[in-house]
Design a protein with these regions (language model features):
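Substrate-binding/access-modulating region of protease and related hydrolase catalytic domains
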Residues: 180-288, 334-339, 343-345
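Catalytic metal-binding/acid-base residues of hydrolase active sites
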Residues: 58-60, 221-223, 275-278, 302-304, ...
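Extracellular S/T/G-rich loop segment that most often corresponds to the catalytic His/Ser-adjacent loop
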Residues: 273, 284-357, 361
Length: 400
């Protein structure tokens, strides 16, 4: 999410740089460029439900009546882990009451930062810029901590809102995870936490597959630099080579868990975020840096389909979508317009779900291939998602 530079040091590091400015040039939340590519799936009243996995920071189920998968007990299908990688099966993170009481204020701040960081000269953007300039170091630390936790808390709800838009045939299963917070960060990273993190990743992936999910939204990456930032802040006396070794061990362990789980689920398409560090994927080294037929890495362009300075790139990134002020509701139902590769991913997931509503027999690799084949290239060569062409191509596939 392109919220504020302060979040780069906090939540964004753990979210693979999901807080870099989007550099938008105008204030509209959507452009005609992308609207002309939208897909509709009318006339499919008898279509089977398509289950989507929202593997993120949690989702507010009340915002999506009839589109949250329910278990035999009638409750939303949810599995979650807290920041210490312990099971906590709640749809949203459990936050301190004092922070929840500030929800209206924090939501307003997020919207103001959406404006400021995407170049929208609104009164709210000017006010938040002035507030940040006037903060003392102590005030800035408290602001960063509160906003970092809140930004993570709302992230998954916005992802779900984008993924479900315009598709009454889709429903979500919620896989929730949390990241560290505070300064110094809690928890401070250890080899034991790395093992628990990998185990939780394997468990959540299996949980989604076991519950019939066909497309999984992964707007995260677990980049090496995130763990290095954590250790630098909370373990300053640890030798640099030890910090690097622990960070790489964590990334490699999570990567192995992801590869094993995805290989065992060929019917599922997994969609990951390239990240917003403005680097190549090998330099960023996220845990999602690998190639499988049913795994797709997504980069971001702006609302006019143009290249951005901040998306990660490389041959591993085979599809791009809008990551510029994408409309996404907050847990209270209010609007926001975040930016980043986090927001590009659910647009691809949305298109994939519409394709599956038309052609449910496609497996993960076939779905990925169709999305890539129907993309069109912009002036700088990035292949851009084209949901309308993808759905039309799916309609032409003969039924088995």
């Amino acid at each position: 999410m392109a919220r504020t530079e302060t979040l780069v040091k906090l939540v964004a590091a753990a979210l693979l740089g999901l807080a870099l400015p989007a550099h938008a040039q105008d204030a509209e939340p959507a452009a005609e460029f992308w609207a002309a590519r939208e897909a509709t799936i009318e006339g499919l009243e008898s279509a089977a439900r398509v289950r989507l996995g929202i593997w993120d920071s949690g989702v507010e189920p009340a915002l999506f009546p009839g589109q949250v998968a329910l278990g035999a007990d009638g409750a939303p299908i949810v599995r979650g882990y807290d920041a210490f990688k312990q099971r906590q099966d709640t749809a949203l993170a459990v936050l301190p009451a004092a922070l929840l009481e500030r929800r209206a204020e924090l939501n307003d701040i997020l919207r103001a930062l959406d404006d400021r960081d995407s170049g929208v000269d609104s009164p709210q953007a000017r006010a938040i810029a002035e507030r940040l300039r006037q903060q003392t170091p102590a005030e800035a630390a408290g602001f960063d901590d509160a906003l970092g936790r809140w930004s993570g808390y709302v992230h998954g709800t916005g992802i779900a809102d984008i993924a479900l838009a315009g598709n009454p045939h889709a429903e979500i299963v919620i896989a929730r995870m949390e990241w560290w917070h505070g300064s110094p960060p809690q928890p401070c990273w250890t080899r034991g936490l790395a093992a628990r993190e990998a185990a939780s990743v394997a468990d959540l992936l299996g949980f989604l597959v076991d519950n019939g999910v066909r497309v999984v939204n992964m707007s995260w990456g677990r980049a090496e630099r995130a763990y290095l930032s954590n250790l630098k802040a909370c373990a300053p006396d640890m030798p640099e080579e030890e910090r690097l070794a622990l960070a790489r061990y964590t990334v490699e362990t999570i990567r192995a868990a992801l590869i094993e789980g995805m290989k065992a689920a060929p019917r599922v398409l997994f969609v990951g975020a390239a990240g917003n560090a403005g680097s190549d994927m090998k330099t960023a080294n996220p845990a999602t840096l690998f190639a499988l037929p049913n795994f797709l890495l997504v980069g971001a362009v702006d609302r006019h389909g143009r290249a951005t300075e901040w998306t990660n790139t490389g041959p591993e990134v085979t599809l791009y979508a809008n990551g510029d002020r994408v409309p996404a509701r907050l847990p209270d139902g209010g609007p926001s317009f975040p930016s980043g590769t986090s927001m590009a991913v659910p647009l691809v997931v949305n298109a994939a779900a519409k394709v599956l509503a038309v052609q449910p027999q496609l497996d993960g690799a076939g779905l990925r291939t169709l999305l890539e084949r129907t993309a069109t290239r912009n002036g700088t060569g990035q292949p851009l998602l084209h949901p309308q062409r993808a759905v039309e191509a799916a309609r032409q596939i003969p039924a088995n």
